[in-house]
């Protein structure tokens, strides 16, 4: 169990009437501006006055301090120490915004760790009649994996298909299966999302993010810091 008191057989009346931090709300605390120690500690005091048991330090759009920098990590430590002094819980959050995996783009600076997807298209190159901008679209730099001869019946349903060579002529429509690397995005600070099917990519994410949090606050793991969200 995450909280040790959950293993107790009975809930005491005293604990029910005045629950400790484990049994109180812990809101997502949006970090979306320039962060300073004094202001962060002031807000933690307000959380405590409101009856919250802790908080999740959640990076959101607008953060001005450099994510995972020494300055940023010191602020994390300051908040953990403040939570401890207030008898509260400080939950960590492992990403710059969401979803977790790219570490704010630090993981995917290395293109080997960038997300990949399968593109199935009747166009060998991007010569479609209509251009549509999508996040997982055509790059013309994809790796051709296979070609297929796809035959549809008069109602547009699949009649047959078979794999053929790149230079073979198709009886129906020739379709191409490409492995593409996802394009860069401002959401990932000019990088991309990570290839979460790659163990090496996930290991790199853990190294950059979780290990850094462990170095900074590991002495409070399973104490003031119950988990990383």
Question: What spans do the regions from the language model cover?
Answer:
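Mature extracytoplasmic enzyme cores
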Residues: 1-16, 24, 41-50, 68-229
């Amino acid at each position: 169990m995450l909280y040790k008191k959950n293993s107790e057989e009975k809930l005491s009346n005293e604990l029910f009437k005045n629950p400790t931090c484990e049994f109180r709300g812990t809101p997502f605390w949006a970090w979306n501006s320039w962060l300073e120690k004094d202001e962060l500690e002031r807000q933690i005091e307000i959380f405590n006055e409101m009856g919250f048991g802790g908080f999740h330090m959640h990076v959101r759009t607008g953060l001005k301090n450099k994510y995972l920098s020494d300055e940023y990590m010191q602020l994390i430590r300051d908040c953990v120490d403040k939570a401890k002094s207030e008898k509260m819980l400080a939950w960590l959050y492992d990403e710059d915004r969401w979803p977790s995996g790219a570490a704010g783009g630090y993981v995917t600076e290395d293109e080997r760790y960038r997300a990949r997807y399968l593109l199935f298209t009747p166009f060998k190159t991007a010569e479609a009649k209509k251009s549509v901008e999508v996040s997982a679209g055509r790059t013309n730099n994809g790796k051709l994996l296979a070609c297929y001869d796809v035959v549809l019946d008069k109602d547009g349903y699949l009649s047959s298909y078979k794999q053929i060579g790149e230079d073979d002529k198709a009886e129906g429509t020739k379709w191409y299966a490409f492995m593409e690397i996802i394009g860069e995005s401002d959401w990932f600070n000019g990088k991309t999302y990570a290839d979460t099917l790659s163990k090496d990519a996930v290991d790199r994410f853990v190294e950059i993010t979780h290990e850094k949090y462990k170095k900074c606050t590991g002495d409070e793991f399973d104490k003031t810091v119950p988990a990383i969200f």
